[in-house]
């Protein structure tokens, strides 16, 4: 593998090998990351990358699209079947572009949209001032109840009645609880708004049937195809409304994108096929079991979990009682081979670049085959590292760093990722 890269560009070959080693021997706990199958990876690295295919299957602006049409048709049909939707657009290059397409299809610049505050668990594209969504549209943010740290639906309704948004967005990037889509739809209908659900984080759980399906309630649903879906990096839009589908298709192309990434779309098709298997369903069940187990074990060790736990693949740890910043915790853990990300918490007092919490997710470690027993050990290692931080920069005592790094590697060796599947590369 990569023998041609090695010959043509040794520097990039070195990057590939070192990143492969990092993934193979490190514990990946970033909630938005996962490990794609070799089938998905091979499809992304295929000759399909050579083909321009502006337009849609059967309606292209280029000739020679017979086989890429077939790939996109498979991706569309599988996405529709997987999520129970009448229409699917598989061309968005990312979740952010999927969200942008929906906004521009259903609203005009200057219209009001409503989404969850970033500091309460939302996403940049849900109206953050630094993002296109916050610059193009007037934004009203809702948040969580500071006592329960769960969505305050009464506040959502109150804000919706007051501001009459064109679009209400449900979903987030750091919200660990199941969202009541039915309640959101009732609020949207009451004020004449479109309900858009961004299920980027929990799409895999939905595909497996272990999480409520927003397609049943929302006017339109967006997602990424990586994260819990375990596919290539890309976006997806679903709807049951033919008029919305037409508007979305026109907004994606020619509105905000040109040529689709056919190698990625084909890899999405592979991902959707994998997600239809019983093995995938069992995997998603274990993802949630592992997240719940980790949250419970963290609580036993004195850590405060935002909202008290999780219903999904992720949870937030408030490090304020431990007098550790999220930035320091992230750096300390990374120095020992454990990757998480710093994250703001509800009622955050620090800058997002420092933050008071960390976000932990289990999709990637579960892909390796790890279960509850391993989650206990991982929590033990996390606690050991965080208890050994010596300064605000996240420096860890050398002897602790060496011990934890060794134990992390040993654990990863017991649950190999690509090591036994890739030939020609010394890992």
Swiss-Prot record:
Q: At what residues does the UniProt record annotate the site feature described as Plays an important role in substrate specificity?
A: 226
Query: What EC identifiers does the entry list?
Result: 2.1.2.1
Catalytic activity field: (6R)-5,10-methylene-5,6,7,8-tetrahydrofolate + glycine + H2O = (6S)-5,6,7,8-tetrahydrofolate + L-serine
Annotated Pfam families = SHMT
Entry's Gene Ontology cellular component terms:
cytosol
InterPro entries, alphabetically? Answer: PyrdxlP-dep_Trfase, PyrdxlP-dep_Trfase_major, PyrdxlP-dep_Trfase_small, Ser_HO-MeTrfase, Ser_HO-MeTrfase-like, Ser_HO-MeTrfase_PLP_BS, SHMT-like_dom
Keyword hit for Transmembrane: no
Q: Report residues binding (6S)-5,6,7,8-tetrahydrofolate.
A: 118, 122-124, 243, 351-353
Which molecular function GO terms apply here? glycine hydroxymethyltransferase activity; pyridoxal phosphate binding
Keyword list (alphabetical) reads: Amino-acid biosynthesis, Cytoplasm, One-carbon metabolism, Pyridoxal phosphate, Transferase
> Where in this protein does the record say N6-(pyridoxal phosphate)lysine is found?
227
* EC top class, as a word: transferase
**Compartment list:** Cytoplasm
Pathway of action: One-carbon metabolism; tetrahydrofolate interconversion; Amino-acid biosynthesis; glycine biosynthesis; glycine from L-serine: step 1/1
Q: Which cofactor does it need?
A: pyridoxal 5'-phosphate
- GO terms of biological process kind: glycine biosynthetic process from serine; tetrahydrofolate interconversion
User: What does the sequence similarity comment in the record state about its family?
Assistant: Belongs to the SHMT family.
Q: What does this protein do?
A: Catalyzes the reversible interconversion of serine and glycine with tetrahydrofolate (THF) serving as the one-carbon carrier. This reaction serves as the major source of one-carbon groups required for the biosynthesis of purines, thymidylate, methionine, and other important biomolecules. Also exhibits THF-independent aldolase activity toward beta-hydroxyamino acids, producing glycine and aldehydes, via a retro-aldol mechanism.
- Spell out the subunit comment: Homodimer.
HAMAP family for the chain: SHMT
Protein name in UniProt = Serine hydroxymethyltransferase
